[in-house]
Amino acid sequence: MKKLILISGLILMVSCQEKSKLDPNINPFFQDWTTPFEVPPFMDIKNEDYMPAFKKGMEENLAEIEVIIKNTDEPTFANTIEELERTGKLLSKVQRVFSNLASSNTNPKLQELQRELSPMLSAHYDKIVLNEDLFNRVEEIWNNRESANLTKEQQKLLKDTRKQFVRSGALLNDSQKKQITEINSKISELSTEFGQNLLAETNGFELILNKSDLEGLSDAVVSAASEAASQKMDQAESEDEKEKYKDKYVFTPHRTSMYPFLTESTRRDLREKLYNSYVMRGDNANETDNNDIAVQMAKLRAERANIMGYKTHADFILEENMLKTPDEVYDLLIQLWKPALKRAKAEVADMQAVADSEGKDFKIAAWDWWHYSEKVRKDKYDLDEAAIRPYLSLDNVIQGVFNTTNKLWGLNFKEIFDIDSYHPDARIWEVTDKDGSHL
């Protein structure tokens, strides 16, 4: 099974194995967490805890904003910008847990909540960034920044805060703000649906093979496919479903399963089938088709950009990037495109030569790329990816990362076992600096 690593930033830092001690009759999000570094007490959190916590978090957040707005003192960095940074603690507490689980260890109930919450959260944040009274306080501080004796860090925070308000529509009139709020809510809803459709199609396809279909596959790849089939058997709810996976081998569009198969399998028909299952996700004219969603999102983004005073969505997004305009992006892409295309054609020619030498009567297609590029690599450089793979096991890669960070920055890692996590395969490390202190 694909291993899961519980990470906060790079690694979740914990320093002891203290267990959660929560009142089971009270929502876990409404209690102080006594776990190391306030690690979420995953075993105590139930799906039904999220919505009440989100609602209370949003209520508290708006109440905190109202306190800032009603402050009769002259707006200052301390009573407005700093206070704004302190708001939303409960909401952030809930959202950090929910967002991570919804993306890494989801279930139908979490997905249902995600669809319900997306427009709610979008509307909530718009209530803050489009609040005229709040923005007026921020704007007054911005206009008086030269005489405020702010540190560089405070200047940066003030600039970023104002920019967030402006780019969210704070300078628009009331009618435009209403339009932006409606558009943001719809985009949020569509974006969630798009992602869930993509996940459903990724998880929904299985290439179930017999032993006779495994031509060219290494022992490691075969073993992983056999284990995947065994896991499917364990999860099966009926005898007929169990029989479906008995003595079989399963490959999926997940890259860790797909790439080794595309590289090693000599069965071109099966390579094509698995490859197409990946590239056609969301484009199968079924209940999880994303074509109409993509069109709707593009139109809404364009409409929002126009309301904000930009020609296109690309112009709006690029304003915050190194390249500021679509023309600058296209110019850079053209510079890269020509040499990249030349190199790609040369690589295809090398692959085609190998296929021709084997007596094949087809032109190299997308699903052939991994297989024949590996053969070219072996012929030209005597480099066998299958021979390297045992050295790149998960544990070896993790240890390599830890050794590198230790050499560069003196960080030390100690795996912790006696702490609750969100999944049985999750692994947790304590991280300390070279002097033994926690970061």
What does each model-identified segment do?
Residues 6-9:
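Sec-dependent N-terminal signal peptides
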Residues 157, 186-189, 196, 200-251, ...:
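Active-site-proximal, well-structured secondary-structure segments within enzyme catalytic domains
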Residues 34-49, 98-117, 139-182, 250-292, ...:
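Short His/Asp/Glu-rich catalytic/ion-coordination signatures at enzyme active sites or charged loops
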Residues 1-4:
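Positively charged n-region of N-terminal signal peptides that target proteins for export
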Residues 21-225, 232-234:
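N-terminal helix-rich structural modules
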Residues 12-15:
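C-terminal motif of bacterial Sec signal peptides marking the signal peptidase cleavage site
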Residues 57-66, 113-128, 187-198, 206-208, ...:
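Charged, low-complexity, helix-prone segments enriched in Lys/Glu/Asp/Gln
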Residues 17-19:
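Sec-dependent signal peptide cleavage junction
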